[in-house]
């Protein structure tokens, strides 16, 4: 098959669901592509693995390959997912921790109701106001069905990527917060300079070695509200987002569904509405292997839409 035909086939595989009754929630296929490329096609249900878990799994796979072929050290044993999960559940049952988490979100909600902003402007919010008969509604309807997705791939040149990384190092900010600021700037521009922008940000919850190496899916998803005034600089906005996100990280084990319920109860949101018009998940993948035995082998990664 040609490269476009193989890519179309893998795209098709990615649209196929999993049989949930007594069957694996993953697909591993060894592939051989034109041009001498060989590798793996992976499709994994998000309920059992997130992108961070996938990165660690593949890194361990490469290390095991080099261990058996070249005699290099084997990777360290990963943490036990069940033990890490039990630790999570014990923390979740701590009443003092739950109260601190709940108080943190109630404090954020005391700033007032957010407003929905969309990359297409105010049209979606206006349609939601009409459909609910609420001219002052500040939340918009979420699209539940269909769930089909698509992907637009944008490749940043290495020189520009290096500039962004240097900027982040210079100002001690993360790439995720820089991207959040870029996204909220675009949403503000599309909504007549609206300063109050809410996004949804994914948190990996992998701060400790045990949580980093245990595999599975540990992501939680929380609102990220930013109110950046027009006279603020781009860096001011990033630092504001950084401070906001640092607060959320300290409460990242709190149930996101309870956060959603707090928003709905506080502001009387109609069912299936939201304040966030976009979401960000940021898990950078390396463009080359750090393994010294594999540095001569080019690495190519392709994402497929589910």
Report each predicted region and the residues it spans.
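Short amphipathic alpha-helices and their capping loops
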Residues: 1-4, 24, 80-150, 232
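Short amphipathic C-terminal alpha-helix that caps PH/PH-like domains
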Residues: 10, 54-65, 238-245
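Short beta-strand or tight-loop elements
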Residues: 21-27, 276, 297-299, 306
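Active-site-proximal acidic secondary-structure segment that organizes catalysis
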Residues: 26-83
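Acyl activation and transfer enzymes in specialized metabolism, enriched
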Residues: 42-59, 146-192, 231, 249-253
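A generic secondary-structure signal for well-formed alpha-helical elements
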Residues: 61-72, 109-116, 186-191, 226, ...
């Amino acid at each position: 098959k040609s490269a476009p035909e193989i890519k179309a086939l893998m795209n098709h595989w990615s649209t196929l669901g999993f049989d949930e009754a007594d069957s694996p929630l993953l697909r591993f296929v060894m592939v051989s592509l034109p041009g001498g490329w060989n590798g793996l096609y992976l499709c994994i249900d998000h309920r059992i693995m997130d992108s961070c878990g996938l990165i660690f799994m593949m890194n361990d796979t490469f290390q095991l390959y080099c261990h058996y072929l070249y005699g290099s050290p084997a990777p360290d044993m990963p943490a036990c997912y069940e033990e890490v999960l039990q630790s999570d559940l014990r923390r979740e049952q701590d009443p003092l921790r739950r109260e601190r988490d709940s108080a943190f979100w109630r404090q954020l909600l005391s700033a007032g109701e957010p407003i929905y902003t969309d990359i297409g402007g105010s049209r979606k919010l206006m349609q939601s106001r009409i459909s609910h008969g609420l001219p002052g509604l500040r939340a918009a309807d979420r699209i539940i069905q269909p769930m089909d997705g698509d992907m637009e791939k944008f490749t940043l040149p290495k020189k520009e990527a290096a500039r962004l990384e240097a900027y982040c190092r210079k100002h001690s900010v993360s790439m995720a917060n820089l991207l959040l600021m870029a996204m909220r700037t675009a949403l503000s521009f599309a909504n007549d300079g609206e300063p109050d922008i809410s996004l949804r940000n994914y948190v990996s919850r992998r701060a400790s070695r045990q949580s980093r190496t245990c595999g599975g899916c540990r992501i939680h998803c929380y609102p990220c509200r930013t109110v950046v005034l027009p006279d603020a600089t781009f860096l001011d906005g990033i630092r504001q987002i950084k401070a906001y996100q640092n607060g959320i990280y300290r409460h990242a084990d709190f149930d996101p569904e309870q956060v959603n319920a707090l928003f709905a109860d506080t502001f009387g949101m109609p069912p299936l509405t939201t304040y966030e018009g976009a979401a960000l998940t940021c898990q950078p993948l390396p463009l080359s292997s750090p393994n010294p035995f594999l540095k001569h082998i080019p690495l190519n990664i392709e994402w497929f839409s589910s």
